[in-house]
Amino acid sequence: MKDLVNFLKAQSKTAEDFDVIKIGLASPDMIRSWSFGEVKKPETINYRTFKPERDGLFCARIFGPVKDYECLCGKYKRLKHRGVICEKCGVEVTQTKVRRERMGHIELASPVAHIWFLKSLPSRIGLLLDMPLRDIERVLYFESYIVIEPGMTDLEKGQLLTEEQYLDAEERWADEFEAKMGAEAIQSILRDMDLEHECEVLREELQETNSETKRKKITKRLKLLEAFIQSGNKPEWMVMTVLPVLPPDLRPLVPLDGGRFATSDLNDLYRRVINRNNRLKRLLDLVAPDIIVRNEKRMLQESVDALLDNGRRGRAITGSNRRPLKSLADMIKGKQGRFRQNLLGKRVDYSGRSVITVGPYLHLHQCGLPKKMALELFRPFIYAKLESRGYATTIKAAKKMVEREDVIVWDILAEVIREHPILLNRAPTLHRLGIQAFEPILIEGKAIQLHPLVCAAFNADFDGDQMAVHVPLTLEAQLEARALMMSTNNILSPANGDPIIVPSQDVVLGIYYMTRDKVNGKGEGMLLQDPREAEKAYRTGRAELHSRVKIRITEYVKNAEGEFEPQTNLVDTTVGRAILWMIAPKGMPFNLFNQTLGKKAISKLINECYRRLGMKESVMFADQIMYTGFAYAARSGSSVGIDDMVIPEKKYEIIAAAEQEVAEIQEQFQSGLVTVGERYNKVIDIWAAANERVAKVMMENLSTEEVINREGNPEKQSSFNSIFMMADSGARGSAAQIRQLAGMRGLMARPDGSIIETPITANFREGLNVLQYFISTHGARKGLADTALKTANSGYLTRRLVDVAQDLVIVEDDCGTHEGIVMSPLIEGGDEKVPLRELVLGRVAAEDVLKPGTEEVLIPRNTLIDEQWCNIIDENSVDSIKVRSVVTCDTDFGVCAKCYGRDLARGHLINQGEAVGVIAAQSIGEPGTQLTMRTFHIGGAASAAAKESSVQVKNNGTIRLANVKFVTNNEGKLVLTSRNTELTVIDAFGRTKEHYKLPYGTTLNKADGAEVTAGEIVANWDPHTMPVISEVAGFVKFVDIVDGLTVSRQTDELTGLSSILVQDVGERATAGKDLRPAIKLVDAQGNDILIEGTDVAAQYFLPGKAIVTLDDGAEINVGDPLARIPQESVGTKDITGGLPRVADLFEARKPKEPAILAEISGIVSFGKETKGKRRLLITPTDGGETYEEMIPKWRQLNVFEGEMVQRGDLISDGAETPHDILRLRGVHAVTEYIVNEVQEVYRLQGVKINDKHIEVIVRQMLRKAIITNAYDSEFLEGEQVEVARIKIVNRKREAEGKPLVEFERELLGITKASLATESFISAASFQETTRVLTEAAVAGKRDELRGLKENVIVGRLIPAGTGFAYHQNRAKNRHNALAAEQAVKFSAADEAEIDAEFNMIADDPTSSLAEMLNMADEE
C-alpha cells in the first residue's frame, strides 16, 4: 500500500519548488528534447475505428495511450504491465493523462521565420539586422535575394537584389559571392552576427552622435543586442527549423454522433503545415524546378505563420464556416484566453446560487440557506457523518439515504452546518465586501435570506438579485472565513473608514419617527422614573411617542480605571428617544440619542459605538437598531399619497416673474445689446434661479406646520408629512426629487449635455403636457444609454487600477523616512470643504507637530493620529501637518505600515501583508460603477446653479491677495489684469477661513490687507463674458482688423448698432490666416503708447469669437474693456465628465490644449515671431542660459513682457499636464494635483474616498525613472528603470564611494505602468499579450513572482494576507538551505586557513571586531 501511495506521489510530480520563471527562445535541440517523436502524417484518427493513426497528429506511440494502462492493440492491459512498451504497436502502457503533457515535433524541410519576432512591432529581427521590415519580408516571402557573402565583388553584405540583378551578378562574378532568399538566408545572416563586436561599434557611434533620433535608435538596438548576449539566446533561433506540436488532449478531436467530428482549429492548422512540409520534402527529393520549390517554401512559411498567429500577416486563414481559425496566439490572449479564462479565474466546486430575499429576523452574522441547497452543498460531509455514526455502511448507502431525504439526514445536516461558515458573493464583486462569510441557518423555501444591513456592502436589493454560495472546505479556509471575512468583522468600509453596516430606508424612517418631537403631544410634560416606564406609558396610550417629557436617564461613564460608573440625571427628552435608549450599549452618552436621528446621525452613532466600545458591542447595537427601526416604521404608518405633495401658492408668481425677465432679455437681444450665447446663458440662469426659489418655497411649505401649543399659542414645528419625513431622515428621496414632485421639474438637458432653455414649469403632481413630456424624454433616455456604456467603462478602469497596484503590499513596519506630504484643509469659496482632521485622521505624523506660534510639541513624530489627536489639533487650531505618505515611502518592493497609516477597515495601524494596492484599486473603482449607474436618477434635470459673479465674504477678517496685478480705473476701483489671482480671508489667529479664485477683469472693492466684515462684497465680475482690459489710456487703433478677412461686422436690424466679431483662425479665408487682429493704443499724434515700466507698446491681440463694440479712433481710459469674449455655455456636470476624467488622470494623458508652464525662473521677453508662433524667452536672473519656446499665436498668454516668473508658473491657461507638474514642481506637487483632481470628481457625487488610496495608485504611476547620468553603472542613459532598482544600485555605489546614478522620475499612465512592470507574467495577463511575451522571450526575462497575479497564475498562495507568512517562510528556508550548501563546500584546507587567520586575530589585539565581521561576511 505504501508503495502505491509513493508511486502516486511520484506520478503527480510537479515542479512545485521553483522561485523564478524564465522565458526565452527555444533552440531546435531543445524542441527535440521536449518531443516524444516526429509527427510525419497529417492524419488524425481513423473514422471507422476512432483509433489514432500511426505517426499522425494523434499518434498513440508518440503521445501515449488512449485508455489508462492499455496499449493500442490491446496486448498489454492493467497496472501490472506499467511502463512496458508494446512491441506490436509501440505504445507505452501508462496513464492516459500523459497525452496532455507529451509533445511531438515536425522537422521542417526549410527554415521558417517565427512571425512574432518578425511582425510584432518593433520587429526584433529587423532591429537586430538593422533592416526595414519590408525588406526582410521581401526576402522571406521569396521576392528578393539577399547578399550573404559578398566575397571579392562590389556588392555589400545584406544588400537586396531583384531576380534580374541577381542573374546579372551571377553572370559577372559567377560563384564569387553568395546570395539566397527565404528564411534560410535570414537564418544564416543571423547566425553569422558577432553580437559583441556589434555592441562595441554601436557604443562608439553613441559617443560620437549628437542627433537625438539617432541616439534613440542606437540605444534601442544596443539594448536588444545586450539582451541577447546576457540571456544566452542565439539570434538564429528566431528562425525555426523544428516546429513543436502541442499535446493532443490540448487540441481535442471529438466524434459527434452522425459520423461528424468536432475539432480544435489547431488540428486544421497543423494539418496544413504537415501537408505542405511533406510536399516540400518530396519536391526537394525530386529536385523540382526552383520556382515550384520556392512557391512551396513560401506556402510553408505562411502556414506556420497562421499556426502561430493567424491574421498577423495577410488575410487570416478561415475554416469551413468562414470564421478565422483560432491560432496558438489567440489561445492565450484576450478575455477568453488561457490567462484570463483559466489561470486568473476558475469555476469552483461546492457552490450554488439562488435569488435573495430579506431576513429581517437574522443576526448580522447569519444568513438563511435553503435546506435543498445545504443538502447538496454539504453532501460529502453528510456521507462522512452517516458512515462514522454507523447509519450507513458504504458511501453508496449513504448516497441513497441522502437522495431519499431520510429524517436522520436532516438532523445530520443541521449538525454538519453548525458553525461551518459559508461565503456569499454577489456579482459584480466590485470591492472586497462583495464576498462575506455568514453562518447558515436552515430555512424552508428556495431563496437565500440576507441580513438587511449588509445590503449596502453587497449593493444588493431584493428585486430579483441573485447571490452565489461557496463552501470553504479546509480547516484553514474555515478559519479565515470566520476570522477575517465574517460580516461582523467588516463593519467599516475600506474606502473611507466609515461604517458600512448602516441602516437605510425603512429602518432609518422608523428610528427617525421614534426620535421626532411634537408640540403639545399627548402626555407632554410628564415626569417618568425610567425608560421602562416611558415604554409602559406609550404602550398603554397615556403618552404619545413624540411627546416631550422629563425622564431619569442612567448613563454609564468610564472612570480613571476604565470601568463604567452609572450616572443618573433628569433629562428633557421624548418618549420615543427614551425607548430607543433602552437598546443603547453601556458607555454611550445619552446626548447622541437625544436628537432627531436621521441617516447621518445613526451612522455617527454606530461609528461612535465602534470607536468607544469595539466591534462586538457595535454589531449587537446595529442589530438592535434594525429590529427597533423595522418595528416603529411599521407603527408609524408612513405612506405616500398624492395630497402629500403640497404645491406652494407662490410657485405661479415666481414663474410669472421669471417669464417677465426672460421677455426682457429677449428684447435686449433683439435690440442687439446681447449676443445669442449671452442671451442663452442669461435665460438659463434666470430659470435656474427661479427653480431654486420655487424649491425653497416648496420645502419651507412642506417642512414646517403651525400648531397650537399647551399655552394655546401658535408655534411652528417640523411637519409630519410622509414625503418630507422620508427625505429629511435620509430614508429615500431627496430635495431634488421632491422639487420635481411638488415644485417644478426645471431645466432639462439634451443628450450632448447642453441645456434646453425652455424649462418644464409643471411638476409630476400637476402632470406634464405632451411637449414637456417629450422634452424630458431626451435627457432620461440618455441616462439609460449612458448607464449601459459606462458600466463597462468603469469596470475596465477598475481592472487597470487593480493591475497596476496588485503587487503593492505592506512588507515592513517602518522604512524610517522623514519625508512626507503637507496636509492643509481644503477651502473653496467661503466654506471649508474638507477640514484638516478628516485629511490627517489615520495618518502618521512625519515631523513633530508644534503648537502654532510656539515651540511646544503637540504630536511627536511617528504618531498615528487618531480621533483623540484630531481633537487636540482642532483645539489648538493647527493649520497644516506634514504626514507620512505612501508616495514618499522608502521601502523598495512594497510599502511600510507607518507610511500607510491606519487600516481604514479595522481602525488600527495596518498589519504587515495587507494588500493595500488592491484595496486602493477597489476603493477607487467601486464607486465608479455606482456613479455611472446613477446618472439618470434625477431624470436628466439640469442642475445648473446660477453662475457666481461676485465674492461676498462670510467671516470677519483680513484680505490677502496672491499673484495679483491690477490697474486703477477712473472711478478709483481696482481692475485685475492677472489671471490666477487668489483671494483669501484670514482670521485673527492667521488661519485661512475662505479662499476664492478671481478671474481676469474682476473689479475689486478692497485692497490687499484691508479689514472686511462678514457679508461685504469685495469683488465682482461678469460671469458670461471675459473682458480685455486696457492698461493705459489713449485712442483705439485697429490693427489687421479687416472686414471679411479677419472679422465680420454684425449690425443689429432693430437698433442699427454694429459690433465687430473676430473670426476663428480656422474659419478665415486663406488671405486672413496670417493676420493677427489687435487693438493698439496710440496718443493723439498717433504714436504708440508704452505700458508703464516697460518698453512694450500697448497692443492687445484679439482671440477668435471676441466682440468689439468700439470704433477705430475711440478714446478710452485705464481699466476700460476693449473687447468682450463670450464664455462657453454651461453643460451639466455629472460623473459623465467624471469617469472619463478620472481615467484621464490615472492614464496621465496630456490634455488637448495643455497649460504652458515656465520651464525656468526668470524675466519674460518676446523674441522674433514666426508665421503662426510667438517666441517666448525667459532669461534667468542668475545669468544662466536663456530658455526659449515657440507658442502658437492663438494661445492667450498670462504674462507680459518684463514680468518675473517662477519655475512652474502658468504662462498660458489650459488644463495642466501632470508630466509638466512632475518635471517642474516635483513629486509632491503632482501627487497633490492628481489626488485633488480625482477627489473633485468623486466629491461632486458625494462619494467619500480616503486620499491614501489615490496616493497608492500615484506611487505605482511613479515607479519608473529615466536615467540622466549613468556613470559606469549597469544602466544606459535614457533607459527607463524601476526607481527601487536605482536605489539599490545607488546604495551599493555609496558604500563603494562612487558617484550616484542620476535619474529623473517619470509619470506613467496606469496601462503603461502595468505593462512596464518587472513581471512579464503579470503584464502578459493584462494586455497586449503577444508584444509582452515577444519582448520578454528575446530578453530572456526572469519573473521573480513578487506580485499577487503571478502567484495566482502559477497556483500558489498570494504573498499577501495569510499567504504573506508562507512566502516569508519559503524565503527563509531557501536562505538557510543556501547557507547550508555553502557551509558543506568548506574543505579541510579552508578550515585550516580560517583557523590560522583566527589565531592571527587573537594574537593581534589591535584588530577590531569590524574586521572580523567583514571577514565573516566575505566567507
Swiss-Prot record:
Which molecular-function annotation in GO is an example for this chain?
magnesium ion binding
Repressor in keyword set: no
- Protein name, please? DNA-directed RNA polymerase subunit beta'
Spell out the PANTHER family in the cross-references.
DNA-DIRECTED RNA POLYMERASE, DNA-DIRECTED RNA POLYMERASE SUBUNIT BETA
Originating gene: rpoC
Question: Subunit composition?
Answer: The RNAP catalytic core consists of 2 alpha, 1 beta, 1 beta' and 1 omega subunit. When a sigma factor is associated with the core the holoenzyme is formed, which can initiate transcription.
The residues listed in the UniProt record as binding Mg(2+), with positions renumbered to this chain, are: 461, 463, 465
**Known catalysed reaction(s)?**
RNA(n) + a ribonucleoside 5'-triphosphate = RNA(n+1) + diphosphate
* InterPro entries according to UniProt: DNA-dir_RpoC_beta_prime, DNA-dir_RpoC_beta_prime_bact, RNA_pol_asu, RNA_pol_N, RNA_pol_Rpb1_1, RNA_pol_Rpb1_3, RNA_pol_Rpb1_3_sf, RNA_pol_Rpb1_4
List the keywords (alphabetical): DNA-directed RNA polymerase, Magnesium, Metal-binding, Nucleotidyltransferase, Transcription, Transferase, Zinc
GO biological process entries: DNA-templated transcription
The cellular component terms of Gene Ontology attached to this UniProt record, alphabetical and capped at eight, are: DNA-directed RNA polymerase complex
| Gene3D superfamilies found in the cross-reference section | 1.10.132.30, 1.10.150.390, 1.10.1790.20, 1.10.40.90, 2.40.40.20, 2.40.50.100, RNA polymerase II, clamp domain, RNA polymerase Rpb1, domain 3
Q: Which domain of life is it from?
A: Bacteria
Record organism: Actinobacillus succinogenes (strain ATCC 55618 / DSM 22257 / CCUG 43843 / 130Z)
Family assignment from sequence similarity: Belongs to the RNA polymerase beta' chain family.
Q: Which cofactor does it need?
A: Mg(2+); Zn(2+)
Among Pfam families, the record links this protein to: RNA_pol_Rpb1_1, RNA_pol_Rpb1_2, RNA_pol_Rpb1_3, RNA_pol_Rpb1_4, RNA_pol_Rpb1_5
Residues binding Zn(2+) 1 are: 71, 73, 86, 89
| Enzyme nomenclature, EC number | 2.7.7.6
